[in-house]
Amino acid sequence: VPASGFFGMR
């Protein structure tokens, strides 16, 4: 999973 998706979900 890309960091963009991870932080976007947070």
Swiss-Prot record:
Subcellular location(s) per record: Secreted
Transmembrane segments: none
Signal peptide: none
Modified residues (Arginine amide): 10
Annotated keywords: Amidation, Neuropeptide, Secreted
Tissues expressing the protein: Brain.
Highest taxon listed in the record's lineage: Eukaryota
GO biological process annotation, one example: neuropeptide signaling pathway
One GO CC term, this protein: extracellular region
Chief location: secreted
Function noted in UniProt: Myoactive peptide. Increases the amplitude and frequency of spontaneous contractions and tonus of hindgut muscle.
Name this protein carries in UniProt: Tachykinin-related peptide 7
Lineage per the UniProt record: Eukaryota, Metazoa, Ecdysozoa, Arthropoda, Hexapoda
